């Protein structure tokens, strides 16, 4: 996918919201939290089942293409459910999504996504913006949130290692939002 084809945070957010509005009888759009730079973290639930499959991307900017791909997959599932399509010879989308839900979180870390797209100037908070500029890290290589924390290493595990003063496991809004979803939903698979 070329850079011209990629969506901005706002485009992806509103495309997910529109899917929730259009297919409201089997799709739910919701905000699961806010980033440290006050961007909303969207999630789209497709299907009616109690058990949930979570599809997660956008944890860091290296996932640059994945949010757009998840959005495309979400659109395909919505159209397939509404039209009662069968994929291949035996994959009945409606039958599947009446038993399980696919919960898509295409952009857990919208701040990193925006930094990669627009540079450190995309950060609204002047203190965070200046702190990030002082790290002298190229925006193309940036993988953290607006506070400079790598979310991949912010989960409370037995192997957690503190990298900075005042950094604790699950110290970040984005991490806490995902943990909250894990605790709320009955999961069968995380991809």
Please provide the spans of the model-predicted regions.
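Short glycine- and acidic-rich boundary segments immediately preceding or forming the N-terminal edge
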Residues: 1-37
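Second-shell loop/turn segments in exported
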Residues: 2-4, 59-60, 163-168
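Short glycine-rich loop/turn motifs
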Residues: 39-43, 148
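Short beta-strand-to-loop junctions in surface cap/lid or active-site-entrance loops
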Residues: 43-50
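Histidine-centered divalent metal-coordination motifs
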Residues: 58-60, 189-191
């Amino acid at each position: 996918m070329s850079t011209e084809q990629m969506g901005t945070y706002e485009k992806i957010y509103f495309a997910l919201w529109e899917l929730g509005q259009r297919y409201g009888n089997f799709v739910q759009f919701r905000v699961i939290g806010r980033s440290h730079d006050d961007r909303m973290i969207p999630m789209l639930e497709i299907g009616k089942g109690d058990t949930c499959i979570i599809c997660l991307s956008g944890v860091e900017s290296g996932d640059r293409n994945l949010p757009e791909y998840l959005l495309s997959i979400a659109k395909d599932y919505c159209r397939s459910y509404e039209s009662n399509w069968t994929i291949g010879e035996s994959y009945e989308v409606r039958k599947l999504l009446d038993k399980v839900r696919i919960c898509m979180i295409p952009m857990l870390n919208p701040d990193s996504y925006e930094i990669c797209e627009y540079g450190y100037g995309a950060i609204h908070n002047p203190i965070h913006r200046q702190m990030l500029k002082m790290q002298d890290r190229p925006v193309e290589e940036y993988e953290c949130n607006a506070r400079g924390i790598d979310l991949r290493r912010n989960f409370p595990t037995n192997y957690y290692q503190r990298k900075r003063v005042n950094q604790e496991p699950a110290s970040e809004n984005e991490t806490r939002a995902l943990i909250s979803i894990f605790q709320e939903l009955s999961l069968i698979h995380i991809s």
